[in-house]
């Protein structure tokens, strides 16, 4: 099934006379935990409760590992890591914890996941 794309018009915020057209994905909804649990249950020997328990534990443990400074590699899926940046200072002495910004979670998809999307097809809708 092709991914549906729509054409949108965007103005340059610095020069409203400059207009370009872009393709963006038409959203078709979202998949929640219950759907994922049901689909995994249907393709495995696990019960829905077992699947949900595993996924819930993963969601709970992921931040624990990341707070320990670990990267989390879910083979075949991808790698999660924390990115921390800070405001710049003129000297190292001025640099304190106060300049640290809130951490962000970065996700890098695995080669397997990227390859799973190579055969994607598109359709432009009007």
Segments the model singles out, each with a brief description of its role:
Residues 1-126:
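Strongly charged
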